[in-house]
Regions:
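Conserved active-site segment immediately N-terminal to the catalytic lysine
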Residues: 63-75
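Active-site C-terminal subdomain of aminotransferase-like
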Residues: 75-161
Length: 177
């Protein structure tokens, strides 16, 4: 609820970052990150969006929505083998990571381990080559399917209609993926 968040932030916005789930897989609930993230950024709050189940299945404009960190996975709407993660990082998020006062406790949780890897020709662990080939094919499929988002929406609507037609109730009335 964007209005409720705005009312809350007017009273208390003394925190560094907020984590949001773009689309919750079990419920199908879709949070409007296009409104929530700019509101948080208005108060100087970094945004971390979990879009594992929505990335490439819902419209996403990372810069326009002012998202600092966007995380996705290969196994959902991308339709690639599981095992790969995607992270987009804003300049504000990089600045915050580089200015940490305490080190990241785990090598694998430290995104800065990947900083400059392409230029250095160094990857911080074993390269998942077969997964990358699968991802390349999945991205080719996405590129060659310009109506993908509309198709996802149409299928989702049909499934919800069938659920209601069968006499079941939807978990929520609106705001679903």
């Amino acid at each position: 609820d964007v209005k409720a968040l705005e009312e809350y932030l007017e009273k208390d916005h003394d925190f560094k970052y907020a984590a949001l789930v773009h689309c919750d897989t079990p419920s199908g609930m879709l949070n409007d990150v296009s409104k929530l993230c700019p509101l948080l950024k208005k108060y100087g709050i970094l945004t971390l969006v979990d879009s594992v189940s929505a990335m490439f299945g819902e419209e996403m404009r990372v810069d326009d929505y002012r998202i600092d960190l966007l995380c996705g996975g290969s196994q959902k709407a991308v339709s690639a083998p599981p095992g790969l993660s995607f992270v987009t990082i804003s300049d504000d998020a990089y600045k915050a990571m580089r200015s940490r006062k305490t080190p990241v406790a785990s090598f694998y949780a430290n995104i800065l381990a990947f900083d400059g890897y392409y230029e250095k020709q160094w990857f911080p662990y074993t390269m998942p080559i077969s997964d990358i080939y699968g991802l390349r094919q999945a991205f080719d499929n996405i590129k060659n399917d310009p109506g993908m988002l509309e198709r996802h929406a149409k299928i989702g609507e049909a499934v919800r209609g069938a659920v209601v037609e069968a006499g079941l109730e939807l978990y929520q009335e609106t705001g679903f993926s």
